[in-house]
Structures are given as C-alpha cells and as structure tokens.
Amino acid sequence: MITIKNQEQIQKMKIAGQVLAKGLNLLKSMIKPGVNCLDLDKAFEEFIKQNGCESNFKNYQGFPKTICISINDQLIHGIPRDRVLLDGDVVSIDAGCMYEKWHADSAFTMVCGIAKNKKNDILIRVTEEALELAIAELKPGIRVGTIGSIIQNYVESFDFSVPRDYTGHGIGLALHEDPYIPNYGIPNTGIRLQEGMVICIEPMVQMGTYKTKIADDKWTVYSADHSITAHFEHTILITKDGCEVLTKTER
C-alpha cells in the first residue's frame, strides 16, 4: 500500500535521515586498508543509538547485523564478518535507522585505499551519477517506469548493467513499502509519484552481466559472473514542486 506522509511523520523521517547521513559519513572516514568489517558495524550501531535512533536492519527478516557490507563482486546484503578490508577493495555499505518507528535507508560505494583498476572508479561514478540524474527528475506525476529508464539508459551507455531482481522502494513505518521502483523500465509507464510520498531510489550496477546469484548464507547477493559492483541509495521526499533528499551527506 502506498502511504502519503503528513508533516509530523515527515519530520521524524528527516531526523532519521540526518542521523543516518552522519553515520554513513563516519563509516566513510573509517574505510581504510586493515579495518575489520565488524568494527564498522559496531561503530554505526553505537552512533545511531547515541543519536536517538534504532537499527532497522538488525533482525529484519533474520538479518544478523546493523549494516550491509558488500565487497567487490558482492552487490548487496553482505553480512559484516571478521574480514579485514584490503587496499583496492570496492566497498558498498547499505544502512538504515529508525526514529520513533519511522525509517530511513541509504547506501554508498567507495574504494578502500587506492583503486587498482580505473574502471572500478568509473563504475562507482556512473552509479552515483545515475542516482543523481533520477533524483533531478523527481516530482509529483513522474512515473516509476520513467525513473527506471533514466537509470538504465545512463548505466547501459557505459556498457554496465542493472540487475533485474532488486529494486528501490517506498519507505515509512515499514522499511520496504509500495511502490517498488526498478532500475530499468519504459518511460511513461507505472505508478505516478504523489506529493508526500517518501521513496528510496537505489541504482545497483554491475560491470558485467545483469544476472545475480545468492550465497549460501541466503543473504549476500553476488554478480553471477563475479564482476565488480556498485550501489548508491537515498531516501527522498516528493514535494509539491520536486523532491527533498532526506539522507544527503557531504562529500
């Protein structure tokens, strides 16, 4: 069910979004060769608690940790483990939090240390730019298929691919709400966005095939050909004349 948020609800989501943005900035500053993934998870959980929020990932459908850390060919939903980041790793972090039961969700990808392959940098840049291009067009009346087509066309112009099985989504009192927003589509098709909706746009991009597979842990999603991946996401309010990003972080 699609929900329209009132001003009180929007304010709570803005608080969650700002705490999340600051928590992700903390993680960006920590990502260096030699850092343990468990330390990143612990630092984020402590940060959001200190700032009046709760985790919305931990125990969600049985997920055991507070953030998702996906490395290199891992696209999404990587479980933080006793693993040390290496120089040149492509690291994606997807995280969320709740303030008084209202959710926010965001993700970023960066290279740990120095990129070993220039194409990895291009992949990351293209994925973030695809998100920015989609956000620039958000306003009441735009249709979900148009959003997906913007992302797909930009990504595929660089000969990268967008997986078909994982999408953006609405968000509010639940982490995942209607509408679901694929990273591909046909312009002028699908549900129209309305003022007061809050959605998550999240381009997930693979350097090779669009196909994916799930690891034995039943959570971690890989590119089927083990090509490098990237993922960016923001929680976004649809306003009267456009949109407002609730999880914007400083570069």
UniProtKB/Swiss-Prot annotation:
Q: How is the cofactor bound?
A: Binds 2 divalent metal cations per subunit. Has a high-affinity and a low affinity metal-binding site. The true nature of the physiological cofactor is under debate. The enzyme is active with cobalt, zinc, manganese or divalent iron ions. Most likely, methionine aminopeptidases function as mononuclear Fe(2+)-metalloproteases under physiological conditions, and the catalytically relevant metal-binding site has been assigned to the histidine-containing high-affinity site.
Q: Name one GO biological process term.
A: proteolysis
> What residue range is the signal peptide?
none
Alphabetical GO CC annotations of the entry are: cytosol
Which reaction does this chain catalyze?
Release of N-terminal amino acids, preferentially methionine, from peptides and arylamides
Listed A to Z, the keywords are: Aminopeptidase, Hydrolase, Metal-binding, Protease
Q: Where does a divalent metal cation 2 bind?
A: 105, 169, 202, 233
Matches recorded under InterPro entries: Creatinase/aminopeptidase-like (IPR036005), Pept_M24 (IPR000994), Pept_M24_MAP (IPR001714), Pept_M24A_MAP1 (IPR002467)
GO MF, one annotated term: metalloaminopeptidase activity
Q: Where does substrate bind?
A: 77, 176
Q: What is its EC number?
A: 3.4.11.18
Query: What Pfam families does this protein map onto?
Result: Peptidase_M24 (PF00557)
* Sequence positions that bind a divalent metal cation 1: 94, 105, 233
Instruction: Look up the domain of life of the source.
Output: Bacteria
Q: What class of enzyme is it?
A: hydrolase
Q: SUPFAM superfamilies, from UniProt?
A: Creatinase/aminopeptidase
What cofactor(s) does the depicted protein rely on? Co(2+); Zn(2+); Mn(2+); Fe(2+)
Q: What is the recorded function of this protein according to its Swiss-Prot or TrEMBL entry? A: Removes the N-terminal methionine from nascent proteins. The N-terminal methionine is often cleaved when the second residue in the primary sequence is small and uncharged (Met-Ala-, Cys, Gly, Pro, Ser, Thr, or Val). Requires deformylation of the N(alpha)-formylated initiator methionine before it can be hydrolyzed.
PANTHER family annotated for this entry?
A: METHIONINE AMINOPEPTIDASE
The UniProt family comment states: Belongs to the peptidase M24A family. Methionine aminopeptidase type 1 subfamily.
Description of how the protein assembles with itself and partners = Monomer.
Q: Which NCBIfam families match?
A: met_pdase_I
Q: What is this protein called?
A: Methionine aminopeptidase
Which source organism does the UniProt entry give?
A: Mycoplasma capricolum subsp. capricolum (strain California kid / ATCC 27343 / NCTC 10154)
Gene name in the database record? map
